[in-house]
């Protein structure tokens, strides 16, 4: 790991941590908040499932627009300034959710979820910053460092949210608000990143769709983005339904589900900190690393649809998350390498918007559980990941530098 990069970009890495930490923090809270009547009678036994679905759906809807917009904005204003906007916006979102509990007003909670989604743009901006800060041959290692930080946040968020929420639902929301506000101040005082505007930015509500439309003029970015979308859709379908399987088929309690999620986080950590570097050295090319990761991850996902028992599912979950890192890091690196330096925020914004869309689709699929067993969706997740190999095969090799 590049310790100097962590030191010089400490505020940025904290922003990445808080983005994923606060995201994971909300899952146990939402389940608890909408488990029964609440919010002064606005949530009832009759509408609680609808309210819970809305609480989950608003974040990815906001993220779909916010990640693309903030990613493009970062190419115009610079990474640091846009990260300040993200953190201040996240603080405002968690402030609204905290206020909703104080006033027993569920629509304030929904507004906070939407604001948090709109401001959840630190990951693509951080990824673009890492690419700017290192040489092309070190790009994958820099992405892996961002993934390590994401993994720590992914493990800490649900655990801390569940513990604090057990005593008072307002505690984790207040913690998220305070940490995001503190990081916004840190970023405002930081000195990394661009200090001048690089190109004009014009606000347009159609911007996320226009950002996708720009792909037609940048064909090199299409293959890695298509592979990334299929890969993420398959994995997030698995992630959504494996929790249902562990609870309904294996009798896991809420605490055990939390520990299961932490185990998945350990897999991400192992993949990022220990496994990615030797695999990268072995396969060398981003395209080959991505294909290896998708083939391994997809095959393991297919096994989860079989009756392997609770212990088998735990082992498979760790291995799946290790393999996930190979494709995740290499595909992000391939996307950033497909455009020039001024458009890396744009392409990373597209990747995060794609993830938001995948989260939304995977969530909608849960409505089919009454008609189909969860194992069907686990198998479908594996098939989707394997389908991602098709576009990955068409990823272009990096262009050789022009000799003077």
Q: Which residue stretches match the model-derived regions?
A:
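Short amphipathic helix-loop junctions that connect adjacent transmembrane helices
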Residues: 28-49, 240-256
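A late C-terminal transmembrane helix in Major Facilitator Superfamily
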Residues: 343-371
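Helix-to-loop junctions at the C-terminal end of transmembrane segments
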Residues: 65-78, 271-285
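Juxtamembrane intracellular "pre-TM" segments in multi-pass secondary transporters
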Residues: 1-6, 192-226
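Hydrophobic core of transmembrane alpha-helices in multi-pass small-molecule transporters
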Residues: 17, 93, 105-121, 312-326
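Cytoplasmic helix-loop-helix junction between adjacent transmembrane helices
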Residues: 112-150
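C-terminal ends and interior cores of transmembrane alpha-helices
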Residues: 88-103, 296-308
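C-terminal transmembrane helical hairpin of 12-TM major facilitator-type secondary transporters
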Residues: 287-331
């Amino acid at each position: 790991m590049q310790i100097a990069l962590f030191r010089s970009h400490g505020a940025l890495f904290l922003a990445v941590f808080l983005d994923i930490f606060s995201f994971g923090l909300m899952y146990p809270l939402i389940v608890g908040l909408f488990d029964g009547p609440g919010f002064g009678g606005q949530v009832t036994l009759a509408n609680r499932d609808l309210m819970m679905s809305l609480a989950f759906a608003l974040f990815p809807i906001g993220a779909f627009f916010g990640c693309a917009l903030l990613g493009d904005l970062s190419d115009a204003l610079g990474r640091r300034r846009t990260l300040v906007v993200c953190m201040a916006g996240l603080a405002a979102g968690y402030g609204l959710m905290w206020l909703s509990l104080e006033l027993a007003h569920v629509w304030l909670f929904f507004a906070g979820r939407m604001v948090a989604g709109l401001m959840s743009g630190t990951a693509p901006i951080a990824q673009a910053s890492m690419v700017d800060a290192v040489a092309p041959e070190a790009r994958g290692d820099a992405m892996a460092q961002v993934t390590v930080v994401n993994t720590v946040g992914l493990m800490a968020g649900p655990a801390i949210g569940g513990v604090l929420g057990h005593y008072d639902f307002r505690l984790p929301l207040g913690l998220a608000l305070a940490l995001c506000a503190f990081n916004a101040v840190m970023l405002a005082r930081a000195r990394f990143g661009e200090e001048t505007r690089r190109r004009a930015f014009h606000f347009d509500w159609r911007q996320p769709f226009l950002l996708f439309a720009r792909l037609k003029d940048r064909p090199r970015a299409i293959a890695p983005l298509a592979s990334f979308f299929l890969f993420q859709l398959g994995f997030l379908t698995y992630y959504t339904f494996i929790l249902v399987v562990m609870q309904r088929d294996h009798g896991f309690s809420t605490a055990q589900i939390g520990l299961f999620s932490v185990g998945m986080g350990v897999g991400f950590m192992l993949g990022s900190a220990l496994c990615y570097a030797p695999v990268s050295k072995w396969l060398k090319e981003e395209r080959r690393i991505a294909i290896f990761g998708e083939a391994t991850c997809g095959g393991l996902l297919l096994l989860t649809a079989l009756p392997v028992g609770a212990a088998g599912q735990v082992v498979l979950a760790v291995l799946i998350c290790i393999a996930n890192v190979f494709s995740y890091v290499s595909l992000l690196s391939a996307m950033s390498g497909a455009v020039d330096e001024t458009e890396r925020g744009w392409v990373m914004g597209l990747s995060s918007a794609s993830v938001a869309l995948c989260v939304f689709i995977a969530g909608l699929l849960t409505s089919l559980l009454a008609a189909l067993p969860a194992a069907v969706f686990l198998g479908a997740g594996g098939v989707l990941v394997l389908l991602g190999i098709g576009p990955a095969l068409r990823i272009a090799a990096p262009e050789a530098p022009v000799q003077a």
